[in-house]
């Protein structure tokens, strides 16, 4: 029974195999029948069907446009769009269905009707032969340019001046074609300044001229706080002409948009002072006798053959602490003030209070000292905390003090007392012509040199005067490394 069943099953499987082979053979022999369907092109649609606006109700040239597409036998792989020019080479590809565009206005016109056309592309590369189109009625807005008051020159500057300004366009910063600056000449003096639309419309440049002689000069432009040389599209340095040394100058800025609309001009004036010396005299004496005291110092410098450039920085008075940096300095410290002070080899700084501009000296003179400059500071000391910022700059370790619980009230040097040199045997011995009250003795910081000392005395609550011996320094020279600073008090 089992043998007969096995034989039967084998015969059936053989027959099934023959039938399958026959069917496959017949299929290959017969081929596929039916009608071939061609790929159908996609269709494209604008989200907005039409726009009806005239006159002042026209749209800004910066517009967000959206569209969509459909493909009956596949899917939309992307789109191509064109603005005004719809010739075959003018289309741009995108996979987006919306974007923000700056629609171009014909140069010289204030209004225009701009054509925007878009067409879908399907997965087989077929393009919508018709596409979708819409004309946008737009009106151009005038751009603007304005100086930033905190980034313009002080009333009087030497050879370096900085200018910061902002530009804007209601149609978007991408619609700005250029921003320009001119000096004293608004007909032929305009110079393009490079800008990036990503900097929120803020620009900052510095202009340096050779101010060793008076007259009209050409200046070089530097960009940003990094003070990097500005170059044009051909790699040449950007120069500006018309700046006059020894005269009041006017700087102008303006902005031009893609349609050629020009902003109103903004302007700022400043005086460019000639630099005649390698020595700069900084007058930071805030009291009424400022000019008389300055002339006293200048007379002694003149005896040494020194005729310095003079910079008055004595505006403002300390109140509840240190004074703000003088408004007679540039408003921008870095790079303007630092670069300016570095133009001299030596600085002679006179002040009547350690809470005046000298507290800013460590910051503003960094490039001056980095270039090998030296400084002489004469300033009366007073009782200040050892944590005061002045000790970060002056080569002073400490100033005169009285032990707690004592009866001493102040310092005095009597008339006729000698001020004797310590470091240089050829230095003259000085003598006070009158009694001096309020001079504080000094202790030199490590690495500096005590130049002069004197016999300080102490006044007391009981009315008598005693000798003061803790320290007796009058002036100190800092010679530790480069640069060095020199101070007399």
Give the residues covered by each predicted segment.
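Bacterial Sec-dependent N-terminal signal peptides
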Residues: 21-55, 126
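Conserved structural position at the C-terminal beta-strand
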Residues: 69, 120-122, 255
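Solvent-exposed loop/turn segments flanking beta-strands in beta-repeat/beta-sandwich domains
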Residues: 70-86, 168-194
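Short beta-strand segments within Ig-like beta-sandwich modules, predominantly Fibronectin type-III
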Residues: 90-99, 192-198, 227-234
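Surface-exposed, short loops/turns at beta-strand junctions within beta-sandwich domains
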Residues: 104-113, 240-248
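Extracellular fibronectin type III
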Residues: 123-141, 258-272
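Helical hinge/lid and interdomain linker segments adjacent to catalytic or ligand-binding clefts
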Residues: 289-392
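A glycine-rich, often tryptophan-bearing local segment used as a flexible ligand/cofactor-contacting loop or short
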Residues: 349, 353-452
